[in-house]
Amino acid sequence: METSLAEEVREKKMTLPPESFFFMSPYRSFTTAGCFSRFSHPAADGENLDGEFQHKMAAAFTAARAAGIAKPIMVGAIPFDTSEPSELFIPTSWETFSRPEKQHSARYASGLQPMDVIQRREIPEQDTFMAMVTRAAALTATPEVDKVVLSRLIDITTRERVDSGALLERLIAQNPASYNFHVPLSDGGVLLGASPELLLRKEGAHFYSLPLAGSARRQPDDVLDREAGHKLLASEKDRHEHELVTQAMKAVLAPRSSELSLPDSPQLITTPTLWHLATQIQGAALANENAMSLACLLHPTPALSGFP
């Protein structure tokens, strides 16, 4: 029976076309088919209910309903730089699926043959990146900078074309409790990943957010692992940085909410590799707010935008 299920998974992993959107969460999981229309308008004013982004989005939904799509949805991604074009679209159809079943079937993807990597390039390279870290650390000792967020890219070339559906299965197998996503892009590429962080979920007037700030590496030994989590929770530095994030989010959400609540202290959540400090934010939005206006209000999150 296990063998037949593994064979079934091998067949089904190819059934997610590169042009399909996939989203899996504890609250709703679904895939899409087809593309009725693409929406590339920049989201720079997306939080403004009277702005161009919101008006164009409403017009796109009106056109979809007029074309016979009974319950149109808009899916995709908004770039870090919201002045750049959005990567959103209205699919012709969508359907939900069982998250537990997908978590179970994705376990078999971890046993599939890995792809042959023929080139791996770090951008910037290690020496350059470490020099950037040294310079950033020195700057934080001056009044000019409080904190710096650094990142780098890894450019990988494989011998064969990457099967994004198979790669998604591996991500789910490694991160079954995360928010897993597969976003087709207008240039033919795919954005996919697994994140433990929730920017925004809205149901009716109620909304929820789970920002993360402050992390520690997991340890292979259970005792040391628990100790790493306790140290993170007790860390004055990490608690301070986490509070800067949550208070910044509270400041922008409060004027748009009729109710807003945050716990006094963060909680610990885990991924397979890291401990994180997290705070469950919840509230009730004002009557005219929609999910996109609140999401644009919060995007990019403070930790990503360099604050704190």
PLM regions and their residue ranges:
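Non-catalytic accessory segments adjacent to catalytic cores
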Residues: 49-157, 162, 258
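Short secondary-structure junction motifs
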Residues: 18, 145-147, 176-180
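A short catalytic or substrate-binding loop motif that flags glycine-/basic-rich loops and adjacent residues
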Residues: 70, 191-193, 307-308
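Conserved hydrophobic/aromatic pocket- or pore-lining residues that grip, position, or stack substrates
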Residues: 143, 200, 247
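An anion-binding catalytic pocket shared by soluble metabolic enzymes
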Residues: 23-39, 157-240, 260
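Short Lys/Arg-enriched alpha/beta "domain-start" segment
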Residues: 1-53, 156-161, 165
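Contiguous alpha-helical scaffold segments within structured protein domains
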Residues: 32-33, 41, 96-127, 133-134, ...
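Short coil/turn segments at secondary-structure boundaries
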Residues: 25, 147-151, 182-185, 265, ...
